């Protein structure tokens, strides 16, 4: 499947997360992104070094600035189960705006065309590192990394595009 690109409508599919009442929710991407400006940024795995030390902290640190520029939702996305994503999210005590969601089976990652084969590292099929800016479901920015790079998908890169 070809990777999602600028101008595409983000595919519908389901993601899972724990809500503020600690209840597991499984919702469609369209239900949380329709009519909104949403940043969906993907990482190869929870608790992995680049994701944990650079990618996620960048979005947490810039969340207020992103919100001030009209962003309604900031979503961190990974092919992990929702329990792992919940635990990972709790490690960022300063986080007030980034929602940690799971694509447990990798099905949504496949719909996006952003799969990354990390079987040789014992991680299976994961998500490429990326940052998408969605405006009422339409992709207006698609910053997708190659391999394990972290050069175009930061919060700063999204801010430059706003």
UniProtKB/Swiss-Prot annotation:
Its main location: cytoplasm. GO terms for molecular function: thioredoxin peroxidase activity. GO terms for biological process: cellular response to oxidative stress. It is an enzyme of class 1 (oxidoreductase). The active site is at residue 51. Its EC number is 1.11.1.25. It catalyses: [glutaredoxin]-dithiol + a hydroperoxide = [glutaredoxin]-disulfide + an alcohol + H2O. This is Peroxiredoxin-2D. GO terms for cellular component: cytoplasm; plasma membrane. The keyword Cytoplasm applies. It comes from Arabidopsis thaliana (Mouse-ear cress). Residues 4-162 form the Thioredoxin domain. It is found in: Cytoplasm. It holds the Pfam family Redoxin. The lineage of its organism: Eukaryota, Viridiplantae, Streptophyta, Embryophyta, Tracheophyta. Monomer. The active site is a conserved redox-active cysteine residue, the peroxidatic cysteine (C(P)), which makes the nucleophilic attack on the peroxide substrate. The peroxide oxidizes the C(P)-SH to cysteine sulfenic acid (C(P)-SOH), which then reacts with another cysteine residue, the resolving cysteine (C(R)), to form a disulfide bridge. The disulfide is subsequently reduced by an appropriate electron donor to complete the catalytic cycle. In this 1-Cys peroxiredoxin, no C(R) is present and C(P) instead forms a disulfide with a cysteine from another protein or with a small thiol molecule. Thiol-specific peroxidase that catalyzes the reduction of hydrogen peroxide and organic hydroperoxides to water and alcohols, respectively. Plays a role in cell protection against oxidative stress by detoxifying peroxides. May be involved in intracellular redox signaling. PANTHER family: PEROXIREDOXIN, PEROXIREDOXIN-2A-RELATED. Belongs to the peroxiredoxin family. Prx5 subfamily.
